[in-house]
């Protein structure tokens, strides 16, 4: 949820560190800081509450020089947003940044206070700094001190430590919070996300759980949780160097909404032919595993959970395989029963979602036949720890409110469902061809849906002055309504809820009045007539109706109901298609409200703490 950048080089690194933080702004933060030391042990630390630009201005004014440094953007967990709580934190000659949550920080704080340490901040991070300083007194090296400290920490952390007396060395420890090392020539870097380093290197080494690494200009030494030196593979990244550029768009979210046709094409490339899904493209051993699957368990959070809820309808109606979907933070704390031949599927844009990772690790101990992830970031923890991965190829997603990651997850899941049904002879060749043709048509249809931008923008003022909004859908369009309500909440700060339309009589009707906009997703399918009855229930109680309706659905607009007529598309891919106008509506409402669309308050892009 926070951002870390570090560098050991012969050149001055302050500008590299600040630029790295700029590239991580999308993750969400409330303060930022940097610390740099030069070869003569001259040391500078600068922290600022607010945006990275304020830190950058301060660094430029101070003429910060030095070849070794660390930088951080903080998203407050322990302690309010303030300059004193901002990272880096200091203890003696030790300077440190940290992502994660130290669960035993209170007992460690008490212990350290008894040893005479004085705390300046409210953070759990300062505990780590003092611990390292204490252990260094009896250790032969900074590496050893960090290793000893790591054994005392409970919780999640990715931490980078610098000793101003050793100005050409950084030590990093990882447990539950991602750290990637960027490998250069005569210089090395590290970050919590490779995006921070794409302007300085394309070669990356991903640390595993429990790793501690020592980094100098010319050497990277990695030690596992047992303290044994190990080799970690270096991979070449093909991620977009200019992912942090909005181009012609006002916001990253807007850019990413309009990138969805291309993202879908990329996700489907090489995975579908003219009339079939290429099962082997889903992952290593996919054919063998899918032949045996009797049940699917999906685990996810947030938008990814909504994608899983949509896919459940496909798994059961198309592939004939039972499917359960659970929120990761709930799944891991209940006593669940593992069904025979059950395939575990995790969904995550970042591949680093803390609760999803923890649920995966728990589930792997409980007898699932295999663990698959649908993910957007190659080399992420979920990808490395799963048996096989189906990458979504959406490209870097900067906006906190997920858009193209959601629709590409849905496309990937639909291909998976089709492959599963085909392998088990539950989907005929004719049905497979119908699904594939619908997928082929989808990018052009999404382009068409994006052309409704101006029409949807005209609706936004009707929502911007309201305090609540209700979204309705039936069947597989209920999760789409849930996702729509989440988007409106995230970026416009309007309270929004979604209900399966058949539940109106069981409570939500009590909320309906002239101040409650009700958005309805209305494709032409078997549930249309029942949905029309639900719409009439809202109309009869004076609700403000906004119906996104298939052109064949037969709705007629009047003073109480606005109709946005959508071209007819395949029932199979319609949930993906109807997502687009929901995204556009939320975006335009947020513009009127004047909120921070790309970095909504209190939210972070990658939730790497529990």
Curated annotation (Swiss-Prot):
Keyword Repeat: yes
Record domain Glutamine amidotransferase type-2: where: 2-218
Any Gene Ontology CC annotation: cytosol
Chain segments annotated as transmembrane: none
Keywords: Aminotransferase, Cytoplasm, Glutamine amidotransferase, Repeat, Transferase
Gene3D superfamilies from the UniProt entry: Glucose-6-phosphate isomerase like protein, domain 1, Glutamine Phosphoribosylpyrophosphate, subunit 1, domain 1
Subcellular location: Cytoplasm
This protein's name: Glutamine--fructose-6-phosphate aminotransferase [isomerizing]
Organism in which the protein naturally occurs: Aliivibrio fischeri (strain ATCC 700601 / ES114) (Vibrio fischeri)
Taxonomic lineage of the native organism: Bacteria, Pseudomonadati, Pseudomonadota, Gammaproteobacteria, Vibrionales
């Amino acid at each position: 949820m926070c951002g870390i950048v570090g560098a050991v080089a012969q050149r001055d690194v302050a500008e590299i560190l600040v630029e790295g933080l700029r590239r991580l702004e999308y993750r969400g933060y409330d303060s930022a800081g940097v610390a740099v030391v030069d070869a003569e042990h001259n040391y500078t630390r600068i922290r600022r509450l607010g945006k990275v630009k304020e830190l950058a201005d301060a660094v430029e004014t101070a003429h910060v020089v030095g070849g070794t440094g660390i930088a951080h953007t903080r998203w407050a967990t322990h302690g309010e947003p303030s300059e004193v709580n901002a990272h880096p934190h200091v203890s003696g000659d030790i300077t440190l940044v940290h992502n994660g949550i130290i669960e035993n920080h209170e007992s460690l704080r008490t212990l350290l206070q008894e040893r005479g340490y004085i705390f300046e901040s409210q953070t759990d991070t300062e505990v780590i700094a003092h611990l390292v300083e204490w252990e260094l007194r009896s250790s032969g090296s900074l590496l050893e001190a960090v290793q000893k400290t790591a054994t005392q920490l409970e919780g999640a952390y990715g931490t980078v430590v610098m000793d101003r007396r050793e100005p050409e060395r950084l030590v990093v420890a990882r447990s539950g919070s991602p750290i990637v090392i960027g490998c250069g020539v005569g210089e090395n870097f590290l970050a919590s996300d490779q995006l921070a380093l794409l302007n300085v290197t394309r070669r990356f080494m991903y640390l595993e759980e429990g790793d501690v690494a020592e980094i100098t200009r010319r050497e990277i030494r990695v030690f596992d949780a047992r303290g044994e030196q190990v080799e970690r593979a270096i991979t070449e990244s093909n991620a977009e160097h200019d992912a942090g550029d909005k181009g012609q768009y006002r916001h990253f979210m807007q850019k990413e909404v309009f990138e969805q046709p291309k993202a879908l094409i990329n996700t489907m490339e090489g995975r579908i032919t003219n009339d079939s899904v290429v099962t082997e493209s889903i992952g290593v051993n996919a054919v063998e595993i899918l032949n045996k699957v009797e049940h699917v368990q999906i685990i996810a959070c947030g938008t990814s959970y909504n994608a899983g809820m949509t896919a459940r309808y496909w798994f059961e109606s198309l592939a004939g395989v039972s499917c359960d979907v659970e929120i990761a933070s709930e799944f891991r704390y209940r006593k669940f029963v593992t069904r025979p031949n059950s395939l575990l599927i995790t969904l995550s844009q970042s591949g680093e979602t803390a609760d999803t990772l923890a649920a995966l690790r728990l589930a792997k101990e409980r007898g699932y036949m295999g663990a698959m992830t649908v993910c957007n970031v190659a080399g992420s923890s979920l990808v490395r720890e799963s048996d096989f991965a189906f990458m979504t190829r959406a490209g870097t997603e900067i906006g906190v409110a997920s858009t193209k990651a959601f629709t590409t997850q849905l496309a990937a899941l639909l291909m998976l469902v089709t492959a599963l049904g085909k392998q088990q002879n539950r989907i005929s060749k004719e049905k497979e061809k119908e699904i594939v043709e619908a997928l082929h048509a989808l990018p052009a249809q999404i382009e068409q849906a994006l052309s409704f931008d101006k029409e949807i923008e005209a609706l936004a003022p009707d929502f911007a002055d309201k305090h609540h909004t209700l979204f309705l859908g039936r069947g597989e369009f209920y999760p789409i309504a849930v996702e729509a309500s989440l988007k409106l909440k995230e970026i416009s700060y309007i309270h929004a809820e979604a209900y399966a339309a058949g539940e109106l009589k069981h409570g939500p009707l009590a909320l309906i009045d002239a101040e409650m906009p009700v958005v309805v997703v209305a494709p032409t399918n078997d549930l249309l007539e029942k949905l029309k009855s639900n719409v009439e229930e809202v109309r009869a109680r004076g609700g403000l109706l906004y119906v996104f309706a298939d052109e064949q659905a037969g709705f007629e607009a009047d003073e109480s109901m606005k109709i946005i007529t959508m071209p007819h598309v395949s029932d199979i891919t319609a949930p993906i298609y109807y997502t687009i106008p929901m995204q556009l509506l939320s975006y335009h409402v947020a513009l009127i409200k004047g909120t921070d669309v790309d970095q909504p308050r209190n939210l972070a892009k990658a939730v790497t703490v529990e």
